[in-house]
Amino acid sequence: MRFALDDEGVAKVKERMAGMEFVFYDAEMLWVLFRTDPEVVKQIVPEPLKPSAEPYATAFVAKYPKTNFGSVYNEAALFVTADYGEEMGGYCLSMPVTDDMALIGGRETFGFPKKIADQISLEKTENGVRGSCVRRGVELMNLSMTFEEEVEAEKAVEMLGALTGQEPGEGWKTIAYNFKFFQSPRLTGFDYKPRLVKQVTTWKPSGKIKLSSGFNLKLKSSDSDPLGEIPVKEPLMGLYGIFNNTMHPGEVIAEVEEEQFRRYAHFKQDYLPK
C-alpha cells in the first residue's frame, strides 16, 4: 500500500534515497551573470552568509525535458553571490517552476524558494534566444540574448570555472545556499531554528555553447514576488546551451536564531499579513 509501505518497501526507499543525486538530461539553459547594487545585497543576505567581494547576481531560464526523478518541467531562477567562510555560492532569491513535484523536492529538501509559475518559456530567436517567466499574471523575468561567440564545451567549463576559482574539470560546480525553515502550527515562530543548507550542482555542457557579453534582463516585482528589487547594473556574461546537470545531496552547515532570521523569512510565501 502506498499510504503505508511494508518493511520491504521502506527498505527499498531508504536504499534508493541514500546519497541520491538528481540528474537533468539535455537541459536547455539560458544563464546570465550581472553586477547588481552592493547596498541591496548587504540588506538581503542573512548571516552567517556574507556578501561576496563583488556584487554579482545570476539569473537563468531552463527547460528540463528529462530527469531521473520523473518530472519534466521548466524553471527560472535568481541568485546573488554570497560567501560562507571562504566558499562563494549563490543565495537563491527566487525559483519559479512549472511542476508541483519539482517544487516540493527543491523546497522541502533543500530550502529553495520555489513557487508555481503560470508560464516559463525559452525560445530561439533569429539571432539568439529569449526566456520569460510569468507568475500570477506578471512577467517577473524577461531575458534575451544575441549570440556573439560559440565555444567548445571544455572551453565553456574553463571559463565558468575561472569565475569561481575552480580547477579545470569535466563540469562546472556551483554552490547554492538556502535557508530551510517551516512556520510553526501556532503561527508564532518556526518549528525549529532555520537551517542554512549548502547544495552543490555540477553542470556538464553537451556540445558547443553560445556566449555573449551583452544581454537584456528585465526583472519586475509583483505583490508576491519582489524580483524587481534587484537592480541590473551591468551585464557581464551570458551563455546558452544544452547541459547534463547533477544536483548532489546537500548538507546543513549552520543554524540561526529565530529572531535574527525572521526579517528574511517572508519572500517564500505570497501572503504577507498587513
Predicted regions and their residues:
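N-terminal ordered "arm"
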Residues: E15-V61
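Helix-rich interaction surfaces within compact, conserved domain-sized segments
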Residues: A82-D83, G90, S94-M95
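Short, solvent-exposed aromatic-acidic interface loops
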Residues: L93-I104
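Beta-strand elements of well-folded, non-transmembrane domains
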Residues: A82-Y84, D99, G137, Q183
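Interaction-surface and assembly-scaffold signal
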Residues: R2-F3, E8-V13, E108-K274
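Solvent-exposed loop and beta-edge segments used for protein-protein assembly and interaction
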Residues: F24-D26, A53, V72-N74, G85-E87, ...
